[in-house]
Amino acid sequence: MKAWNLDVQNATARVQLPEGLVVQDYYMSQGYYDLETGTWEIGDIPAYEERSLTFICLLNRTGSVTVNANVTADGDDNSANNNAELTFKVFGISDLEVNVTGNKETARIGDTVRITVKLKNRGPHDANNIKIGNFLSGGLVVQNFSYDAGYFDDITREWIFETLAAGEEATLTLDCLVNRTGELSDYVSVREVDEGDVNVYNNMAHASVAVKGTDLDLDLSVSKLRAYQGDVVNVVCRVRNNGPETAQNARVNLQLPGNLQVQHVQLDRGTYSNGVWVIGDLADNETALLNITARVMSAGNFTLNATAVSPAIDDSNPVNNDDTARISVAIPKKTLKVRIKNNSAVTIRVLLYVTVNDHGKITRKTYNFYLKKGLSRDLSLGYFQLGTTALFKQYTYNTNYRSRTVSYENTYNATSVITQRVNVSGVKGRQKAPVVRIATLLLDENGTSLQ
């Protein structure tokens, strides 16, 4: 209540509280209020000042509520604004309960799943302007629907009610086509309702169906876990579809390391190129096999990785889509042997110095012996890797008192056999002038060479 530019006297207001508003308390800034008659005796109000009356009320019914008030005062020259009205709507209390069930726990692509949604108003009041949202997984396509109350919008997936009476229950049925694998669900929730809900914990529910797709099971192996440089190995990749659906456009990514040189590819279906094995469709319980024959070109520890995928359909068990095979490659070792045969007519003395370089590891050996005519001596120098070089420095002496012809034959046996013959005439006797021969031997996978 406000006086504008003039003082007013003996102001009296009447406030009419309708049924549904039960006064619990009230207070005013001036005057006296009679609760029985609804009359507020205010008294005088100076210009530009306000006086107020406040009610604290209990709402005990739903619907539209209107409060009317009017005021009279001496000195009030404008009665046009002496009346006021306040209207508001009182909503009730409801307890909407949602339940969702499906007729299948598991399904396959192409199956129809029936989802049943039940909405119950547990009261105590009617619920108005209800919207129930259905959040369907992308793999569930609504084909048919029916309901016994309200209205279902198949575009927005909303189930709409003007009113659901206290104690009333409604049912919505959705028949959905399954067109995707995975865990598919319908999440249902109360999106809108005019009334306050005393229990929001039962406003949401969901039902799920597990749709299995393919299950590609990949196994990768090598014929030799330990191999030598130059060996030939088989890389075998097996893919099985454990189902239940057909794996469409199945493929395997199998990139071979650089130390494996492909010699031959054998497969029972599809093509293998640039590290990709395109299998195509692989039906339930079918198996595809790939066998790659490759030569090991260098030493080291190498890992092969393979991954199977079916891009057109989900794999319900991706754990077994990958596999790994490891191969440890060493440089092979060969025995280095030398046979020295005396083809001279006299006994000779051989003094042999050997220096072996096995990839930086140096081995030195010295041999000093006499060899009668026509006899041989076998020397075993040890085991060495391919790529080893051996330097032979050989001194051969004439043990006779007179000059003689020194003739001997060296046979080197490693990755291949090489024979070296030496024939020197007029060699002074009694170890005065030995025959000196220096040679370098190379052990290679293609054979032994002498320089």
Curated annotation (Swiss-Prot):
Keyword Nucleotide-binding: no
Disulfide bridge positions per record: none
Keyword Protein transport part of the UniProt annotation: no
One Pfam family hit: DUF11
Key words, A-Z: Plasmid
Family listed: To ORF5 in pFZ1.
Descriptive protein name: Uncharacterized protein ORF5B
